[in-house]
Amino acid sequence: MSNYKTSEHYGHALSHIHDTGFAGVAEAAADMLISTLKASGLTRGRVTDLGCGSGILARKLLDQGYAVEGIDQSVAMLALAKSRAPEAVFRRESLLECEIPPSIAVCAIGECFNYRFDRNNDEAALDRVLHRVHQSLEGGGIFLFDIATPDRIMKAPPKQFYQTQNWTTLVENIHSETPLMITREISSFVRAGEYYERVDETHHLRLIDPDT
């Protein structure tokens, strides 16, 4: 086994794992969004995907005739997205500070508003993002998002384990009540020929109370 290293957030190894092992969330969100758009009579137009990841949602939207603009901070994720959905426009920017173009829909799937990849992620920053989303949406537009809430402290198991033939991922969830946060210590082992490469990442998620 090779020496391990600490990666950027969603570096090459974890981006590959997320893309191949956890596509279901983005696929389900895309199906829900497409169904809602069509039911609303919105069959053409731009969808802005905040935290677009590897472009799974973008691909499905493009296949239905929508234009897509995706924004993410991970170089590795954006490389996957550009390969999967070359017709889309992708930008590497902070979700907290990016410009959001006029859109018939904006989506932010995968708890991207919770991640503290940008240290400026706080209630004021989230308020500003939501204001920009509101300004960007055309009449009748749709905003689809998810967030991790404080009850995640009770729901998230202390440790999680995922494995395929080509990779193994171990996740330790560390809870904090002051402030309300979850820290995920992620160790990934990815097959590289006859060996496995270990890559560690630490993700901090600010838990958001929807009632505040």
Model-derived features: positions:
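Non-membrane alpha-helical structural segments and their capping/turn regions in soluble enzymes
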Residues: E27, V75, N120-D127
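SAM-dependent methyltransferase
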Residues: L144-T212
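Conserved class I S-adenosyl-L-methionine
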Residues: M1-L42
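A short SAM/SAH-binding and catalytic strip from SAM-dependent methyltransferases
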Residues: I104-A124
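A short acidic, Gly/Pro-enriched loop at the edge of an enzyme's catalytic core
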Residues: L96-V106
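Class I SAM-dependent methyltransferase SAM/SAH-binding core
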Residues: T48, S54-E97
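A short glycine-rich, Lys/Arg-flanked "PGG" loop and its adjoining helix->strand segment in the class I
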Residues: A124-G139
